Amino acid sequence: MPIPQPYDWFHLVWIGIVIAISIFLVCKFKNASDSDVRKMAGIFWGVMVVFEIIKQFLFGIVVEEDRLVWDYMWYFFPFQFCSSPLYILPIVAFAKDGKFRDNAISFLATFSLFAGICVYVLPSDVFMQFTLINYQTMIHHGTQIFFGVYLAFRYREKLNFKNLLGATAIFSTLAVLALLMNVLTYHLFPALGVNDYMNMFFISPYYDCPLPLLSVVYKAVPYPVFLCVYIFGFMLCAGLIMLIMKGIIKLSEKNNGQITNNK
């Protein structure tokens, strides 16, 4: 297929699909049992993992002299912000009830939801010549959106500042791990003869941050300041998502109450 363009038929169809699935999940399973939510989290996680494995193989296989050669592109290693559901969904699916799981739910309903929305609004960088990759990215980021929206409705009582701080702790931990990977590979790859690099979470101290707005901050301030702005900025965005979702949920409950009273 030709490389999709922002807001062409391919993109618009997937926007419609994600909106439809979001509405379906909220209407059908808003009050589902915790056991059912765990099953859904496990299923969505499995789907995302399978497509991610396929994606990684496609990025690792190249054609040289009419034969397939494995030459993995470490830049695409699955530890970006949008890869976080691969590591957080199992917590929602399998962890015991408690603060840690509540924070994971809050993370998926705020941070991860925001990341998915960003890709769907500005998808230019994720579309490419591989048809399967284009479907994978729409499925992956679409799942971030519709399951994030669903979790916000299902666990609406957990949408609070306390759990947002817990979600921020998860995000910060992932960012620190990403930074360690960036630093270690920067020094290890040349010694190992690997002609590639990592910029996980786009916070490498050695390579520019390509994200909108943050790319300007990266070049304008010392790196430690950039890192603080990065984490605090995404926390603010996640908080905004939380407030928007709380408003939508409140409006939905109000409308449902009016419909019930009119019957």
Predicted regions and their residues:
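Membrane-interface helix-boundary motifs at transmembrane edges
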Residues: K28-A41, A95-A104, R154-L165
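Juxtamembrane "helix-exit" motif on the non-cytosolic side of transmembrane helices
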Residues: Q56-D66, Y120-Q129
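Membrane-interface transmembrane-helix boundary segments in multi-pass integral membrane proteins
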Residues: M1-G16, L165-T168, F189-G239
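Alpha-helical transmembrane segments in multipass membrane proteins, preferentially the mid-helix core
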Residues: I21-V26, I88-I91, T143-F161, A175
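Membrane-embedded alpha-helical segments of multi-pass membrane proteins
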Residues: L12-A20, P78-I88, L108, M138-F146
